[in-house]
Amino acid sequence: YGVTDWTFVGTSEGSVSAFHAARMNPQLARRLILTSSVWGPTRNGPGLSDADWTALQATLLWVHHQDDPCEFTSYREARRYASRTRAPLVTVRGGGPEKGGACQAFTAHGFVGVERAVVRAMRSWVLTGAVPADVEAP
């Protein structure tokens, strides 16, 4: 297709796939955005706990809701990984109303009620390279 400027994005367990895709395709992946990321082991694998961050050439942005209710995707770990990788973390606050299980899309895990603002922040980073401000529900 002739596209040479790619941004890989992964959410929750998809963060693991996006990380490995970016790591394995450095000629394509200029940027990587990981949202509501799975840190530790689940029944599907090790999460990002065994990721080799030194092998990642893409510029990285973390996006995470401060009140993410999913047991595998704590905000505390998001802060730790952002520090460990020396990559910026956009913190999301507010939103709702929530419905469904803790690790489902219609909770803070999926940025319910603030989806557009979160996408605008990510898009701004892709287009400008400037780290966006934290996202707060109006």
Regions inferred by a protein language model and the residue ranges of each:
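Alpha/beta-hydrolase fold nucleophile elbow
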Residues: 2-12
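Residue in the alpha/beta-hydrolase core beta-strand immediately N-terminal to the catalytic nucleophile
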Residues: 7, 31-33
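Stable alpha-helical elements in mature extracytoplasmic
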Residues: 14, 18, 49, 77, ...
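Short glycine-enriched nucleophile-adjacent loop
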Residues: 15-26, 32
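Soluble non-cytosolic domains of exported or imported proteins
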Residues: 23, 69-72, 112-117
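The feature captures the conserved acid-bearing segment of alpha/beta-hydrolase catalytic domains
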Residues: 36-94
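C-terminal catalytic histidine-bearing segment of alpha/beta-hydrolase fold enzymes
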Residues: 87-138
